[in-house]
Amino acid sequence: NLIQFSNMIQCANKGSRPSLHYADYGCYCGWGGSGTPVDELDRCCKVHDDCYDQAGKKGCFPKLTLYSWDCTGNVPICNPKSKCKDFVCACDAAAAKCFAKAPYNKANWNIDTKTRCK
């Protein structure tokens, strides 16, 4: 679920940036998404959105699905339990790892999505 995703982000980035900083970044980080991602971090969010879409097509509810995971050496590791839980956990873990590698450009936080995300 979204709280677990937030915790995974903190695991992967070693707590260097609050999870909320990703909630309104670029065209895809946060609710919804459209247009072309503005940078590598925004592409991470688009891939995560697409992964959640795939989870939904499998009958899962990714924003609400609780799963089991551990933070081992600043790497989120999923503990498989069921199809939906494992799929959603994998979406979140991949995004958290992607966020940790991608540069954060403050200029892409809280952008005007109506003009920048076409």
Curated annotation (Swiss-Prot):
Expressed by the venom gland. InterPro entries: PLipase_A2, PLipase_A2_Asp_AS, PLipase_A2_dom, PLipase_A2_dom_sf, PLipase_A2_His_AS. The active site is at H48, D92. CDD domains: PLA2c. It is an enzyme of class 3 (hydrolase). One of its GO terms (biological process) is lipid catabolic process. GO terms for cellular component: extracellular region. This is Basic phospholipase A2 PA-10A. It comes from Pseudechis australis (Mulga snake).
